[in-house]
Swiss-Prot record:
One of the primary rRNA binding proteins, it binds directly to 16S rRNA central domain where it helps coordinate assembly of the platform of the 30S subunit. One of its GO terms (biological process) is translation. Keywords: Ribonucleoprotein, Ribosomal protein, RNA-binding, rRNA-binding. Gene3D superfamilies: 3.30.1370.30, 3.30.1490.10. This is Small ribosomal subunit protein uS8. Belongs to the universal ribosomal protein uS8 family. NCBIfam families: PRK00136.1.
Length: 132
């Protein structure tokens, strides 16, 4: 079955696994998803991730992070730019998520970066999702 929005699928799997208190979640892998998982790890939203080869596209295993072993660190993870309605922002139009407590994730010419990094570099791009 073809998937129209693999990033939304990844975010939904992470959100559902967090609500179900799972320690890890397996997601079909791609370069974009690995970049997004790397950014989430660097920002402290997930413990870690690893790519497992399975002679097809591979599996991205994401290890979730919890506060006091019960509440997920990710309170909300939301897809912004969708296949049916892409959302592009310039460096001046990058939104602050929860007054700077959260992170907006952008796909730019410099790669997958956070809103803070995009402002520092003065670049805009496609607003993939917000996390807090």
């Amino acid at each position: 079955m073809s998937m129209t929005d693999p990033i939304a699928d990844m975010l939904t799997r992470i959100r559902n696994a967090g609500m179900a208190k799972h320690q890890k979640v397996d997601i079909p892998s791609s370069n974009l998803k690995v970049s997004l998982a790397n950014l989430l790890r660097n920002e402290g939203f997930i413990k870690n991730y690893k790519v497992i080869a399975d002679n097809k596209q591979g599996v991205l295993r994401v290890y979730l992070k919890y506060i006091d072993e019960k509440d997920p660190v990710i309170n909300e993870i939301k897809r912004i730019s969708k296949p049916g309605g892409r959302v592009y922002v310039d460096s001046d139009g990058i939104p602050k998520v929860k007054n700077g407590l959260g992170v907006a994730v952008l796909s730019t010419s410099k790669g997958i970066i956070t809103d803070k990094t995009a402002r520092e570099l003065g670049v805009g791009g496609e607003l993939l999702c917000t996390v807090w």
